[in-house]
């Protein structure tokens, strides 16, 4: 594994992954393993911020189809991301890694309000910044949040952790002929309609010239491997 390609990154983690084999809620062994991977990556000298989804607990889009208004459903989903970040922060600190949870929603008894300056200070001091609450607004995904926060805090890239090792022409779990891309431009990712991230996230990444690295979180040590240029992944840039 070589020297890290980037010195500051935002890691986007799926809430569904936090559920582990139970497919709902928070699976502690899974959280601990993710925490270990983040700590190992931090040990490479990389400053790390993390955005976590909330789909293991609540999905606003799904309940909006059953009568709950989309703004209310999305706000409930934002609260789920806070729960995930609190769980991950606890695991990180238990393993000796300083971590601080920030939320785009004001909840001072629970965690700090997100500001660019406070998040950057945490990173500069060696802590991992956990960025919860989405953008604080409905209709924006946590993928878009990850790109937005990365642009705000001057990160070099977004590391998008998924259950497959990159962007494919089709779902590789359903189509054995699906081909993996080594590289895509932001425009190609948008034109292809690949579901690994939403169009708003890709468009914002293109506007801010921010690389997105799509990789599988399934293998232990995958975050550090990608940072060192050794892991299988698709780079979306240019």
UniProtKB/Swiss-Prot annotation:
UniProt keyword Transferase, yes or no: yes
GO terms under biological process: 'de novo' CTP biosynthetic process; UDP biosynthetic process
Regulation: Inhibited by UTP.
Statement: the UniProt record of this protein carries the keyword Kinase: yes
Binding site for ATP: 12-15, 55, 59, 162-163, 168, 171
EC number of this enzyme: 2.7.4.22
Keywords, alphabetical: ATP-binding, Cytoplasm, Kinase, Nucleotide-binding, Pyrimidine biosynthesis, Transferase
Subcellular location: Cytoplasm
Subunit structure: Homohexamer.
Family indicated by similarity: Belongs to the UMP kinase family.
Matching HAMAP family: PyrH_B
Role, per record: Catalyzes the reversible phosphorylation of UMP to UDP.
Name of this protein: Uridylate kinase
Species assigned in the record: Rhodopseudomonas palustris (strain HaA2)
Source lineage: Bacteria, Pseudomonadati, Pseudomonadota, Alphaproteobacteria, Hyphomicrobiales
